[in-house]
């Protein structure tokens, strides 16, 4: 894989020349006017990296959901119904006074019935207590076989002593799945299997370092360590050629993003409803467009793709949005790496500083949580910062960020249209049609949106849907998604060379762009959050 042509897999098969026509010089009108023949939809769906990310993620989700579904007791509904009917029956048959009688007779009857009534009440209470103490807990049978290195303080072996079998399980699943996908796409499965153990070992090392208790307290997440591990290798001894078949940055991250779609449930938007939607969906596009305009017109950043990726990274939701946008605008690996580095650095700073600022300003937890959710890039960092302010702030912050995450697909789609229609179009040439926009559109976004809709429906309308979906996510797919992201960050580091990155840092313009854009984001998000949560919908969201 050549780091200078990272987009060859983003929207077309590997055996088709996707970039030569799109990236032709402005003077080559014939190339722009007559693009090469595009592959058929069937061939695209069987060889394209984006489509295979969807197929791989869909297979994993199907297996994960089926495992939880099959693991239910056959008589679960009967147990629940029987328990409920028993409680109701006991309450209804509890002895009561027979009716009016003489005063002395009533006293005698009351005395006789006191003990049975108390016993009946005690039985009902005990039944309810047992039901409360021993409810059926949905769990994924796959959970013991899927794990990541755990937390450790002094002894590094503590991180893997209890999770090594789960780590091995993840390795075998991803190795087998991606080897098969590579073979079907016309690549060498053997070359992938020879290199993948090293990439996976580096990802395990990143997880292991992030699990150290002091490191964890500062929320220095695995993504940062994975990048550093890869960068150290690529910028010192260099990335060995034999590793390149397993350095599949886009494939890993796209598969992880499709898995993420199952976690972004539309039904959960109702938790905050319109206030959160206004904060996330009105401010975000304004900040993105304004920041991109500022980078082009004021800072005059040479690379439009770098400008766009940084703008999306900062305004939408960090790394996931950066990668989706990079696929849509065909950004270079170095540009994506720079954007992610800026995002991770400022995420750590904002996660530590913003809760203190909110407390010092006397902002209440609801408003503070909404501010955190709309500004901090990483979902994990949002949750960590919200937890500092309390459970109420955590709930609001996480929900606003979840609402904002839905814009990943929308952003990628809009950027793809803008890029094909305006950025790469020759003004003297013919207007690019819908087919070219479809060809350039990152198809994995369709998987992200489809999984979000599908599992939202299952969550809302299926019997025991919330329990089933939560068990599936918590017991398997969330762990796999984390591994895919970690493998992607290791790959980004291995493909990034600082010598190629330095020209992009000339004059510090990317840093200035990020700081200015984030400053605008902070101001607009706070204003909108105040209007929505404290003025317009104050009664609705009041605790």
From Swiss-Prot:
Coiled coil: none
GO annotation, cellular component aspect: plasma membrane
InterPro entries reported in the protein's UniProt record: UPF0324_pro
Region (Disordered): 1-41, 91-120
Domain of life of the source: Bacteria
Biased composition (Low complexity): 1-22
Localization of this protein: Cell membrane
Keyword tRNA processing: no
Presence of the UniProt keyword Transmembrane in the record: yes
Record keywords: Cell membrane, Membrane, Transmembrane, Transmembrane helix
Ranges annotated as spanning the membrane: 51-73, 160-182, 189-211, 221-243, 270-292, 307-329, 336-358, 368-390, 403-422, 437-459, 479-496, 511-533
Principal subcellular localisation of the protein: membrane
Topology versus the membrane: Multi-pass membrane protein
Family statement drawn from the similarity comment of this UniProt entry: Belongs to the UPF0324 family.
Name of the protein this chain belongs to: UPF0324 membrane protein RB9488
Organism expressing this protein natively: Rhodopirellula baltica (strain DSM 10527 / NCIMB 13988 / SH1)
């Amino acid at each position: 894989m050549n780091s200078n042509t990272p987009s060859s897999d983003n929207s077309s098969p590997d055996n088709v020349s996707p970039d030569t026509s799109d990236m032709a010089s402005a003077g080559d009108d014939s190339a722009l006017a007559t693009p090469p023949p595009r592959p058929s939809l069937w061939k695209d769906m069987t060889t394209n990296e984006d489509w295979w990310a969807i197929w791989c993620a869909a297979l994993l989700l199907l297996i994960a959901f089926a495992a939880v579904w099959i693991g239910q007791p056959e008589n679960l509904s009967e147990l629940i119904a029987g328990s409920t009917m028993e409680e109701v029956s006991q309450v209804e048959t509890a002895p009561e006074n027979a009716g009016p009688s003489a005063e002395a007779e009533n006293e005698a009857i009351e005395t006789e019935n006191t003990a049975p009534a108390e016993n009946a009440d005690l039985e009902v209470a005990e039944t309810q207590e047992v039901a409360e103490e021993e409810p059926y807990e949905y769990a994924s049978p796959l959970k013991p076989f899927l794990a990541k290195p755990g937390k450790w303080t002094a002894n590094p072996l503590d991180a893997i002593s209890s999770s090594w079998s789960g780590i091995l399980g993840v390795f075998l699943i991803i190795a087998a799945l991606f080897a098969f996908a590579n073979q079907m796409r016309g690549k060498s499965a053997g070359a992938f299997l020879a290199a993948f153990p090293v990439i996976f070992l580096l990802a395990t090392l990143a997880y292991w370092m992030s699990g150290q208790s002091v490191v964890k307290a500062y929320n220095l997440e695995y993504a940062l360590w994975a990048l550093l591990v890869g960068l150290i290798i690529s910028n010192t001894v260099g990335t060995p050629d034999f590793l390149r078949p397993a350095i599949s940055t886009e494939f890993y991250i796209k598969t992880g993003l499709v898995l993420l779609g199952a976690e972004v449930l539309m039904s959960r938007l109702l938790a905050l409803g319109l206030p959160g939607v206004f904060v996330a969906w009105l401010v975000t596009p304004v900040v993105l467009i304004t920041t991109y305009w500022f980078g082009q017109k004021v800072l005059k950043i040479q690379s439009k793709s770098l400008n766009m990726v940084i703008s999306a990274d900062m305004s939408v939701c960090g790394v996931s949005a950066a990668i989706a946008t990079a696929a849509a605008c065909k950004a270079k690996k170095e540009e994506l790496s720079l954007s992610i580095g800026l995002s991770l650095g400022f995420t750590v700073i904002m996660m530590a500083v913003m809760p203190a600022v909110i407390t010092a300003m006397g902002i209440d937890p609801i408003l503070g949580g909404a501010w955190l959710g709309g500004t901090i890039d990483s979902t994990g960092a949002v949750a960590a910062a919200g937890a500092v302010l309390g459970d109420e702030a955590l709930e609001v912050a996480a929900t606003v960020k979840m609402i904002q995450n839905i814009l990943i697909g929308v952003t990628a789609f809009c950027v793809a249209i803008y890029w094909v229609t305006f950025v790469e179009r020759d003004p003297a040439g013919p207007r690019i049609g819908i087919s070219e926009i479809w060809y350039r559109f990152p198809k994995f976004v369709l998987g992200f949106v489809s999984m979000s809709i599908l599992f939202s429906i299952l969550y809302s309308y299926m019997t025991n849907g919330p329990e089933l979906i939560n068990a599936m996510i918590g017991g398997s797919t969330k762990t796999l998604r984390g591994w895919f992201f970690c493998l992607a960050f290791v790959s980004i580091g291995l493909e990034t060379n600082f010598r190629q990155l330095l020209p992009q840092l000339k004059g510090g313009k990317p840093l200035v762009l990020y700081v200015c854009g984030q400053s605008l984001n902070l101001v607009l998000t706070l204003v909108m959050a105040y209007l929505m949560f404290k003025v317009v919908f104050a009664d609705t969201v009041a605790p």
